[in-house]
């Protein structure tokens, strides 16, 4: 929030939203489109996993995700789970019930996010649970992974990689056509009432992982 009582105190420099990165050449080679939902993500992963992406003769991975405990894995799980939980914008809340303060984790939406998060490991490196952000960045830039959840940092880093330069694209994080209905406490198909912000029936909930950065000048 840049303003308090209508007065500007800081200027936003970095939103720190997670983005979805993918290898354009790999998806094209296997006739795949960038996934818009997590269901589509798994179809793409199944089609491309275990193929050689960087020409070294070794099988590579459809996905790299940072999941190391006591590191930054919580950013990944919330980026995955958010579209199942929050359907009506930021006023609804994704971490807590905004009216009661109750954590929003014991519900079908977060459970579905955990299921997806776990299943992603079927298409990643064997040691994925011990990988943090620097590990997955390195693997992606070496051409070992075709899909990646990351901040904007990867974009300029990829420009310096002889392996992936000009061979990658980005989009918003995958969403879902099925979401948690808080009234019925079930996963249900999106409709205009349940998912008013959905695009073509797909609910997205972009996650500002790490919050962001802003700048200010001390008046003293």
Residue ranges and their predicted role:
Residues 25-26:
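Short, well-ordered alpha-helical scaffold segment located
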Residues 7, 29-33, 102, 118-132, ...:
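A local structural motif
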Residues 38-44, 127-142, 175:
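Short helix-initiation/N-cap motifs at beta->coil->alpha
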Residues 18-22, 215-217:
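Short glycine- and hydrophobic/aromatic-rich loop-to-beta-strand nucleating segment
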Residues 6, 29-30, 122, 161-220:
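Extracytoplasmic/periplasmic substrate-recognition and gating elements
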Residues 2-13, 18, 42-102, 143-145:
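Extracytoplasmic/periplasmic solute-binding protein
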Residues 45-47, 89-130, 172-178, 189-199:
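Glycine-centered hinge/linker elements that transmit conformational signals in sensory
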Residues 146-151, 169-170:
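Paired acidic/hydrophobic, glycine-rich loop segments that form the ligand-binding mouth/hinge
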């Amino acid at each position: 929030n840049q303003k308090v009582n209508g007065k500007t105190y800081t200027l936003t420099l970095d939103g720190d939203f997670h983005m979805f990165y993918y290898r354009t050449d790999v998806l094209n080679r296997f006739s795949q489109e960038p996934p818009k939902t997590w269901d589509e993500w798994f179809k793409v992963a199944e089609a491309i996993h275990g193929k050689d992406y960087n020409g070294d003769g070794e099988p590579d991975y459809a996905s790299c995700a940072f999941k190391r405990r006591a590191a930054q894995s919580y950013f990944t799980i919330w980026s995955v789970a958010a579209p199942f939980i929050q359907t009506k914008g930021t006023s609804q809340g994704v971490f807590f019930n905004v009216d009661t303060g109750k954590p929003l984790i014991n519900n079908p939406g977060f459970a579905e996010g955990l299921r997806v998060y776990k299943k992603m490991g079927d298409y990643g490196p064997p040691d994925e649970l011990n990988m943090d952000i620097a590990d997955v960045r390195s693997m992606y830039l070496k051409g070992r992974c075709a899909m990646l959840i990351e901040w904007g940092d990867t974009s300029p880093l990829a420009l310096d990689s002889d392996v992936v330069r000009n061979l990658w694209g980005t989009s918003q994080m995958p969403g879902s056509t099925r979401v948690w209905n808080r009234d019925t406490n079930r996963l249900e198909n999106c409709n205009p009432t349940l998912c008013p912000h959905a695009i073509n029936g797909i609910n997205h909930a972009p996650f500002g992982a790490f919050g962001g950065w802003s700048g200010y000048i001390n008046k003293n």
